[in-house]
């Protein structure tokens, strides 16, 4: 029988490392709640990024997935994960930095992604997963609360920005619930939140997404400027383009919808 999460981590003398952005979850009931939000189904394929001491890993495995592949950069955690693997042969362990893996080579079938992501790689990894990996059916991620609010923000709100636009033209997004700092060891200085991201079946092309990224980088750098001013150098006939698209030339970056940005990108 596996020891508790706390005893297991203690027996391996694993303390969180700041360089890996580690904040461990010892509460198995919270792990179970996250897995319920993800709606992991029996016989599904799951990838967990950064399993650490294996709290979420255990909760996923209890749902009896067809396979669970965990990607862990911290070699100290590998022996602990190997011990979990002795009880669950459907667990596959990859010791690697997820930012250096070619994820398209790793994923060969439809997969669910679940992760308590380190804050310092969260935004970069979300965008990369959405842009590069076509076989992800859904992602349930723990991120900094502020980042989740930006992902899910609607136009004309303070949180709305580039991240909102890119995520929402590639996926359906939904904030599930907040997680207090006290749920982690060590306690982070900010709240976290769970977000569910369901990639669209027919997303825009990478070329079009790259254009949206180019446009949003310009307009949100001066979000109080009017769109016609922000895009004048990139699109010399911007007034004509916006008029054709029936977008108000005097609108600011935060007023346009993700769909508006896609429509502008199509004119580039």
UniProtKB/Swiss-Prot annotation:
Chain coiled-coil ranges: none
Places the protein is found: Cytoplasm
UniProt GO cellular component terms: cytoplasm
Keyword rRNA processing: yes
InterPro entries per UniProt: KsgA/Erm, rRNA_Ade_diMease-like_C, rRNA_Ade_Mease_Trfase_CS, rRNA_Ade_methylase_Trfase_N, rRNA_adenine_dimethylase, SAM-dependent_MTases_sf
HAMAP family named among the record's database cross-references: 16SrRNA_methyltr_A
NCBIfam families: ksgA (TIGR00755)
Protein name: Ribosomal RNA small subunit methyltransferase A
Source organism of the structure: Rickettsia prowazekii (strain Madrid E)
Gene: rsmA
